[in-house]
């Protein structure tokens, strides 16, 4: 590790691919990509799994890569992408307002310092004057199509960021055809500047769990072998968690041995989830463990009778893919991108609580159907990989470099 002429407070780790030569001193065989990972939250979440999976696959494929990250993530990315150059931003950008300001001022300087050919901003927002072509990932359009399902302040910011990306980004990446179509429909975005790159799944982490893993997670959750339904994701209105709680309670209320419902994920901004929890009959068990450790996710998902993800809208639906990779039967909705992920290997429901009740009751009553869904989902998950996603991203980066000056 050494200190370079980066902006004040910024540190860098040099890797062998970076010669330190200026742009004029080398030919561009493959683009040098700077991925801005500073928006990844401490709990990682779906955004962290996307960025981590992508940069690891890019690095493994031999991409000429640099990663800008939070200071707290410097060691993590140093191990995850050993052949890349890691640039840690100042400590202050751990706070969102400072990070957004640094995105406009510090990030372009980092792009210049590492001699990037293209900058990838993987979470909606971008620097307005980057000095290089910019690729922006737009995950979904629910800030426009489901505004009531988001914190109003966040919705206002992200709508502005998406509009800016649609106007000013060299190219946009989306994780599904549904998101591409929404971008075109809602914002009249230029479809020729949008590339679809499906997410992948880490098959080393997400796999059919051994019974020992299932038992260990069950004990850690305090279930001690009790059957349960699983949900993984933020507990917020867009994910339709209140309707899931109501639908589950109605589906299992009269069963002699009702399965618990475990809501794995951080709390969102709305009180609707708390209100739905308060209405659950006293004899039913609902567990809210918060964020789960990554290493516990296979046992948590694969040990569930059903993984329910009845979202009102997704850009992709990573929990659905991860649950399928763990061999779990999945119940989701037909909304937006979810059929692109689940195909015919999952069960579907409408997002209202009555439909969820009916679908869960049918699945819980038919073990054979659940096992068939688990097998089909596991096979379908094999079709998704971060290596394939990285290939699609690299093709987008190359197009962006080719458009420089347009």
Segments from the language model and where they lie:
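Carbohydrate transferase catalytic cores enriched for Leloir-type hexosyltransferases
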Residues: 1-406
């Amino acid at each position: 590790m050494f200190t370079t002429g980066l902006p004040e407070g910024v540190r860098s780790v040099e890797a062998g691919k970076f010669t330190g030569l200026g742009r004029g001193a080398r030919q561009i065989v493959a683009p040098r990509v700077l991925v801005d990972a500073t928006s990844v939250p401490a709990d990682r979440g779906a955004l962290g799994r996307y960025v981590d999976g992508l940069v690891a696959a890019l690095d493994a494929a031999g991409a000429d890569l640099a990663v800008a990250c939070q200071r707290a993530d410097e060691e993590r990315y140093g191990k995850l992408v050993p052949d890349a150059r890691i640039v840690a931003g100042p400590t202050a950008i751990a706070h969102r307002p400072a990070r957004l300001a640094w995105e406009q001022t510090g990030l372009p300087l980092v792009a210049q310092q590492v001699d990037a050919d293209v900058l990838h901003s993987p979470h909606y927002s971008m620097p307005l004057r980057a000095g290089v072509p910019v690729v922006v990932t737009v995950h979904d359009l629910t800030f426009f199509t489901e505004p009531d399902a988001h914190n109003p302040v966040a919705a206002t910011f992200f709508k502005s960021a998406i509009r800016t990306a649609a106007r000013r980004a060299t190219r946009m990446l989306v994780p599904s055809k549904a998101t591409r179509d929404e971008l075109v429909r809602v914002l009249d975005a230029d479809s020729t500047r949008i590339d679809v790159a499906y997410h992948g799944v880490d098959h080393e982490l997400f796999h059919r769990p051994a019974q020992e893993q299932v038992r260990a997670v069950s004990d850690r959750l305090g279930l001690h072998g009790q059957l349960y339904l699983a949900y993984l994701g933020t507990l917020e209105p867009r994910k339709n968690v209140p309707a899931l709680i109501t639908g589950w309670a109605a589906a299992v209320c009269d069963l002699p041995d009702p399965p618990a419902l475990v809501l794995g994920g951080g709390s969102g901004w709305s009180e609707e989830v708390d209100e739905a929890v308060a209405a659950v009959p006293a004899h039913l068990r609902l567990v809210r463990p918060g964020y789960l450790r990554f290493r516990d996710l296979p046992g948590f998902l694969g040990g569930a009778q059903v993984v329910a993800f009845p979202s009102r809208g997704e850009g992709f639906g990573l929990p659905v893919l991860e649950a399928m990779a763990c061999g779990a039967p999945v119940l989701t909705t037909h909304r937006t991108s979810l059929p692109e992920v689940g195909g015919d290997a999952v069960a579907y429901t409408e997002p209202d609580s009555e439909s969820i009740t009916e679908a869960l009751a049918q699945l819980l009553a038919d073990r054979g159907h659940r096992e068939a869904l688990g097998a089909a989902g596991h096979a379908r998950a094999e079709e998704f990989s971060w290596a394939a996603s990285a290939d699609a991203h690299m093709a987008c980066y190359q197009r962006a470099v080719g458009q420089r000056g347009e």
